Amino acid sequence: MANIFEVPQPDNDLLEKAEKVRLASIKISQTENKNRIKALNFMADYLEKNSKEILEANNADYSSAEKKGISKALLSRLKLSRAKLNAGIEGVRKVGDLADPVNQVQIKKELSKGLILERKTVPIGVLGIIFESRPDAVMQISSLAIRSGNGVMLKGGSEANLTNTSIVKALQEGLNESGLDRNAICLLTSRKDSMAMLNLEKYINLIIPRGSNELVKFIQENTRIPVLGHADGICHLFIDIEANLEMALSVALDSKIQYPAACNAIETLLVHKDIAPAFLEKAIPLFNSNDVKLIGDNRSVELGLKYEASLQDWKTEYLDLILSIKIVNNVEEAITHIQKYSSKHTDGIITENSNTANKFMNVVDSSGVFHNCSTRFADGFRYGFGAEVGISTQTLPPRGPVGLEGLVTYKYFLKGGGHIVDDFSSGKAIYTHKDL
């Protein structure tokens, strides 16, 4: 991989910021649930009070990005409409309605009389988030961090610097008004600082990158800090021979055009050969009328597609109104294609045959496998998590959309009355190992 990024050592200014966030995170980790909820409400209040300033900053960012020729996908993510801002503010409040993820008892055992073991959830500490464009992500991530008792260091794309700065200022004012330390939320604005974050293992406990495949892989390979995230969103939808044709058309269209710049939008449509003629006869004009460029394999082109796909197309996350189509002989071939090219984000099947659906869902190794529904449902808010800090495609947990439950870890608490191991070794005491 070309070394387009460098990992500098953090300078004194960055170290000072990191130390402030670390100390603030310790305070917040000890803050009662009701006070963390109170902080979220104040954060939302200050976002509302500063909404005019935030939208003006976003208009300036958007205008500048347009002049620089930034891609349509990034421009779409950058734009913060009044409706999107209001939804983000409401999302901050709704995070407060979620169950407290901190101090939850997962295990409680009596090891011996008077010797009690508990496993309880605790905050991770300081989160380091690196993301592109989407300024609404600042609200989501910050609210989840505070709700789960964590501090957060944020680095958004430079194209959104004015918007992100305005949002973070409002969030910090809300924190301060609530009585919590405003330093729990910190925004970095330079590329150098975002890369130097990778050397802050003494301050940051988890890095969550949300950006290009190249950036995510670079971060995973160049830090000693644990990394949670996904590099690509190459999602597939398979139209089985026993699919309901109208359902297949509706779900395929929604999975692509509802928000093509999203990582849960499909990039490849796999179609069973025996339903392909009837499906494509309706799908081609439907997608064309929605400005979707269709490219496909030889069999798809023979059935009416204008553009032939290359090998690279099956590996590409378009994040745009472009869709690759491949005709397959059976569900096994569809699964083989997905296992080869999927980014393990979300893959779906449309079929009325429950056995085929179960086979597909059990074998495809993605964080989300869907039956007869749009891949666009792969989202923390739509799952009822309130919001998400990111999506993980790794096999170990957390996996899929990561909400509050993915921002806590656990700790073992053992309370006794002078118990010593030697008494158990000598037979003076016995283990009971009783669940409480």
UniProtKB/Swiss-Prot annotation:
<comment type="pathway">
    <text>Amino-acid biosynthesis; L-proline biosynthesis; L-glutamate 5-semialdehyde from L-glutamate: step 2/2.</text>
</comment>
<keyword id="KW-0521">NADP</keyword>
<dbReference type="InterPro" id="IPR000965">
    <property type="entry name" value="GPR_dom"/>
</dbReference>
<dbReference type="GO" id="GO:0004350">
    <property type="term" value="F:glutamate-5-semialdehyde dehydrogenase activity"/>
</dbReference>
<dbReference type="InterPro" id="IPR016161">
    <property type="entry name" value="Ald_DH/histidinol_DH"/>
</dbReference>
<comment type="similarity">
    <text>Belongs to the gamma-glutamyl phosphate reductase family.</text>
</comment>
<dbReference type="InterPro" id="IPR016162">
    <property type="entry name" value="Ald_DH_N"/>
</dbReference>
<comment type="function">
    <text>Catalyzes the NADPH-dependent reduction of L-glutamate 5-phosphate into L-glutamate 5-semialdehyde and phosphate. The product spontaneously undergoes cyclization to form 1-pyrroline-5-carboxylate.</text>
</comment>
<dbReference type="InterPro" id="IPR015590">
    <property type="entry name" value="Aldehyde_DH_dom"/>
</dbReference>
<dbReference type="InterPro" id="IPR016163">
    <property type="entry name" value="Ald_DH_C"/>
</dbReference>
<dbReference type="InterPro" id="IPR020593">
    <property type="entry name" value="G-glutamylP_reductase_CS"/>
</dbReference>
<dbReference type="Pfam" id="PF00171">
    <property type="entry name" value="Aldedh"/>
</dbReference>
<dbReference type="InterPro" id="IPR012134">
    <property type="entry name" value="Glu-5-SA_DH"/>
</dbReference>
<dbReference type="GO" id="GO:0005737">
    <property type="term" value="C:cytoplasm"/>
</dbReference>
<keyword id="KW-0963">Cytoplasm</keyword>
<dbReference type="GO" id="GO:0055129">
    <property type="term" value="P:L-proline biosynthetic process"/>
</dbReference>
<keyword id="KW-0560">Oxidoreductase</keyword>
<dbReference type="GO" id="GO:0050661">
    <property type="term" value="F:NADP binding"/>
</dbReference>
<keyword id="KW-0028">Amino-acid biosynthesis</keyword>
<keyword id="KW-0641">Proline biosynthesis</keyword>
<protein>
    <recommendedName>
        <fullName>Gamma-glutamyl phosphate reductase</fullName>
        <ecNumber>1.2.1.41</ecNumber>
    </recommendedName>
</protein>
